[in-house]
């Protein structure tokens, strides 16, 4: 398109001069907010129709306005229209483009009844709602990859750890599902957050509302919102919902980082629990033997970045008075960075998880070591009438005895158990403790709800699958149940 490169500002009538070059450079935001252009054009269409319903645009003017906005959208899509150096923000750039197409008289009418304050507050909500659905879909892909690995793991037992020390044997599937559930909760948080952000600030004006008879409810419906914000000041200035999204993104990063840490450890030569697919690993520029878990390491590193975005945003918001202040321009880069990070990270991370190969023999071999069956001894003693305080001490005595000999618990003799338990159990009963001295026996005994017994793990996998089926509706719909429409399709 032929661009009008003449400087256009959305303010200035009471000023005797334009902004200084230094102020213009500081104020400029098109380098990051241009990504809101599609949402802005969609919002402008809805606003134009509101102006038409209010009698502020004739039917002919409304048609020409919509045609001009369609043309502007095409030019944005094909790259023939873009911001220029003088454009303060994406709203300024798009108004310049609209006036270039529709003319100054018609193009200049679109701003009636709309402030950049309510405009940008609505656009960031639209953008985040759309991308939250994309992120939710990517998270569910990762959950499904963990479920698939859990199903493949079957009855494989591994050493469960607390404080990074051997604790108790658990099913590998149980360990993997322990990472699936937090990710499911991250999706649930996005869905819950969407209920609150599903309100349009359009019609709030600068802060006090509008006097032109516009219909904010109609605009809200056209833009995929189920309602309008209840307070015009809150509508223009509230960024708690942006911060809430930033928290969910940061929490997602933390949940992924914790899984990354385990994968990195499991992938070491010392552990050798898992091998990563070549397609999801990297090498060294100098050491030919290296096969590095870069995706897991990058995920761990990027979690700090996601947390930093949240912290920076909260620091910006904490000192602001009520109503709009220019500081709020700083809300966007934080969440833009988070979305960009997650939308690149999650597909790579899911691919790594999906293609991991676990060494079942190695896991089974390590599962009962490190005196991991000591708790089973204590619980066996309790079942045989020994108070737990004493059972705990007796099990600890068995550990001390085995450790002193450089043995494992199952290496102790019947006489060892008879002598250790003599004050509480008859000699003929003490050797019966051997029935719990196997990792599979230990796992199978933990069959309460949420436990690591095979049947319970199968149960939780089924529950997770059902939850995913319900949650996957979110990426394809708005919170009010209607089909979510991408910008430009209203």
UniProtKB/Swiss-Prot annotation:
Where is this protein found?
A: Cytoplasm
Residues folding into a coiled coil are none
EC number(s) on file: 4.3.2.1
Keywords of the record:
Amino-acid biosynthesis, Arginine biosynthesis, Cytoplasm, Lyase
Q: Does the keyword Metal-binding apply?
A: no
Under catalytic activity, the entry for this protein gives:
2-(N(omega)-L-arginino)succinate = fumarate + L-arginine
Q: Which GO biological process categories is it annotated with? A: arginine biosynthetic process via ornithine; L-arginine biosynthetic process
NCBIfam families per the record? argH
Family recorded in the similarity comment: Belongs to the lyase 1 family. Argininosuccinate lyase subfamily.
What protein name does the entry list? Argininosuccinate lyase
Species name: Bifidobacterium longum subsp. infantis (strain ATCC 15697 / DSM 20088 / JCM 1222 / NCTC 11817 / S12)
**Lineage of producing organism:** Bacteria, Bacillati, Actinomycetota, Actinomycetes, Bifidobacteriales
